[in-house]
């Protein structure tokens, strides 16, 4: 593949060769980072086949760049966790983007850790099973290994009181009310919310109810 453009809103990165941003002695590429404000215009000029988006974690935050890609018929792939299956968390935005993508003849999709370890690995094992009565999973990862968007979504740096008032404020909310809060955009669910939707869609299952609890973990040191 050939890199034809790179965009960022960080003023400290604009104008630098992408190799400087990558670091670790990466060879000179010859492509300078441009201001993200110019993405729409430059996308039309460059006409890339694919746009890789590695910025934020919700579809609402990526609506603008997704719209730009669809407008220019550019396939977009992103590490945005919600984008793997946003139909059960941001249905209105997703339907809008889906329509734009079809009109533009392109694909907008989310990939990454989720689609393998929380997705296809599960469906592959399920497909080899004669009978399934329950699927249970656990996942651990170091928030520091990822970007600021993931850290914010997990409440990193918040006090217990702040966490309970923001992220954990709906822990006791009934399933039907939680569904309304999520789909209206008033509350951003955990990544597992979308993952459950993805798994059920792949296994031809219908979600009757879904709840979540966000419990803070505090370092004892």
Residue ranges and their predicted role:
Residues 46, 64, 92, 96, ...:
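Conserved active-site and cofactor/substrate-binding residues in soluble primary-metabolism enzymes
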Residues 1-71:
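N-terminal glycine-/serine-/threonine-rich beta1-alpha1-beta2 phosphate-ribose binding loop
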Residues 9-11, 56, 80-84, 113-114, ...:
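Short, ordered loop/turn segments at secondary-structure junctions
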Residues 104-132:
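Adenosine-phosphate binding glycine-rich loop
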Residues 61-63, 67, 71-72, 80-106:
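Rossmann-fold NAD(P)-binding glycine/threonine-rich loop
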Residues 127-221:
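Active-site-lining helix/loop region of Rossmann-like oxidoreductase modules
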Residues 20-25, 95-97, 126-128, 153-155:
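Short, hinge-like loop/turn segments at secondary-structure boundaries
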Residues 78-79, 108-111, 136-137, 209:
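General beta-strand structural signal in soluble alpha/beta enzymes
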């Amino acid at each position: 593949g050939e890199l034809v453009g790179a965009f960022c809103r960080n003023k400290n990165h604009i104008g630098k060769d992408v190799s400087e941003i990558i670091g670790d002695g990466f060879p000179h590429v010859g492509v300078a980072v441009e201001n993200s404000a110019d993405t729409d215009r430059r996308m039309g000029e460059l006409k890339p086949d694919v746009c890789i988006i590695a910025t934020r974690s919700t579809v609402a935050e990526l609506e603008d760049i997704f719209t730009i890609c669809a407008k220019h018929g550019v396939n977009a792939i992103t590490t945005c966790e919600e984008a793997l299956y946003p139909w059960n968390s941001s249905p209105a935005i997703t339907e809008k983007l889906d329509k734009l993508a079809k009109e533009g003849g392109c694909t907008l999709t989310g990939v990454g850790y989720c689609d393998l370890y929380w997705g296809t690995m599960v469906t592959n094992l399920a497909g080899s099973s004669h009978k399934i009565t329950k699927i249970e999973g656990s996942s651990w990862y170091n928030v520091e290994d990822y970007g600021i968007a993931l850290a914010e979504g997990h409440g990193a740096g918040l006090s217990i009181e702040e966490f309970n008032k923001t992220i954990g404020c709906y822990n006791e909310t009934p399933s039907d009310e939680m569904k309304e809060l999520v789909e209206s955009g008033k509350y951003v669910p955990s990544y597992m919310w979308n993952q459950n939707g993805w798994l059920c869609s792949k296994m031809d299952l219908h979600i009757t109810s879904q709840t979540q609890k966000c419990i803070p973990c505090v370092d004892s040191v």
